[in-house]
Design a protein with these regions (language model features):
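Compositionally biased, low-structure terminal segments
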Residues: 1, 19-22, 291
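Bacterial N-terminal signal peptides that target proteins for export
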Residues: 2-13
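Bacterial N-terminal signal peptides
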Residues: 11-21
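Predominantly soluble domains enriched in secretory-pathway, periplasmic, or organellar proteins
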Residues: 26-337
Length: 337
């Protein structure tokens, strides 16, 4: 009888273990398909990425190495290393001019990079620690958050001149341009406020609280669904903000240390790079309903990622592997949809 009970228990344990394993496999959202070294020194922090969809280039800011890489997504090869970008944080591509702009935190400038020459052709002085940036194409304006300067610098990209600077009582987080409402949004992360800028006159026309979200630093948009997604670094929440009602409607927990957040419009999937060692993944079922799919494990100190909307691949730079210094880009494909 005792042997039968033992066998029964072992069988039950095996079934439970198999079920948990199967569930874990089914729940996985991403798989690593490639990784390649980058030319900068290992162990140095990376920051924002942006994709040039015309040329299939990934532009990667290597903040602590003070340089920026241009990577061909078709070959996963670095085709250029742009220097003179000290402390580069934000990078933003302007397609019609074949230029991209770097937010250089270490000399408080915005660098103008000509993609044909692959070099900095001009620098614009800002207040303090320029960070994230967003391009409002119909207005030919680039909006750059001067995080520690508590400001938003506005650049006319046709002249490459700062035409206005908006000042706030808060550090500024990531801005975004909404092509549906034709408005610019910016996180006021010290005050937990979502600000709205009219790019016609470049006036602030609204300020709205973000509910339980603390430290709304990162932002991405789902323009067709009239939603903004915020990464709240103060309390590790992914917050959904209704752009019509101007209020936060959903709060979901994510891994510690959230930073850059991106939305895959085709899959309706939200990714957040978390420096504790995970990419938190969420699914939009409809504009009012969301599910957390998983905290996909990656190396620690991953702060940034980019999503290729054509291939749905996710790109994330790593500065360490199990504590060992590296400098590389990791490529992930979607497993479950």
């Amino acid at each position: 009888m005792q042997n039968k009970l033992c066998s029964l228990r072992l069988g039950t344990y095996a079934l439970l273990s198999f079920a948990l394993f199967s569930s874990s496999v089914r729940a996985q959202t991403l798989k690593e398909v490639a990784k390649f070294d980058l030319p900068g020194p290992g162990g140095k922090r990376f920051d924002y990425l942006t994709i040039d969809e015309d040329d299939h280039y990934l532009i990667s800011a290597h903040l602590a190495a003070e340089q920026t890489y241009v990577i061909d997504l078709r070959t996963n090869k670095v085709i250029a290393t742009v220097s003179d970008t000290p402390g580069v944080e934000g990078v933003e591509y302007v397609p019609e001019l074949k230029k991209f702009y770097t937010s250089n935190a270490h000399d408080n400038t915005i660098g103008v990079v000509d993609l044909k020459q692959m070099k900095v052709i001009k620098k614009l002085k800002t207040d303090a620690k320029p960070d994230g940036s967003a391009y409002a194409a119909p207005f030919h304006k680039l909006y750059v958050s001067d995080e520690r300067g508590k400001a938003e610098a506005i650049i006319d990209v046709r002249k490459d001149e700062i035409i206005k600077t908006l000042h706030f009582d808060s550090e500024t987080g990531m801005p975004q341009y909404d092509p549906v409402t034709r408005k610019v949004y910016v996180n006021l992360q010290d005050e937990n406020i979502f600000a709205v800028i009219d790019p016609v006159a470049d006036d602030v026309i609204g300020r709205y609280p973000v509910g339980k979200c603390k430290g709304n630093h990162g932002m991405t948009l789902a323009p067709e669904q009239h939603r903004a997604f915020l990464s709240c670094e103060g309390n590790d929440l992914m917050t959904v903000f209704d752009l019509d009602k101007h209020q936060a409607i959903v709060f979901l927990p994510m891994a510690r240390g959230p930073d850059v957040i991106k939305f895959d419009v085709g899959l309706k999937r939200i990714y957040v790079a978390c420096s504790s060692g995970a990419i938190s993944v969420f699914q939009m079922d409809d504009p009012d309903h969301y599910r957390k799919l998983e905290d996909f494990l990656v190396q620690k100190k991953v702060h940034s990622l980019a999503v290729d909307v054509e291939t749905h691949r996710v790109y994330a730079p790593e500065q360490e592997e199990d504590g060992k210094a590296v400098a590389r880009m990791v490529v992930y494909e979607v497993v479950s949809r």
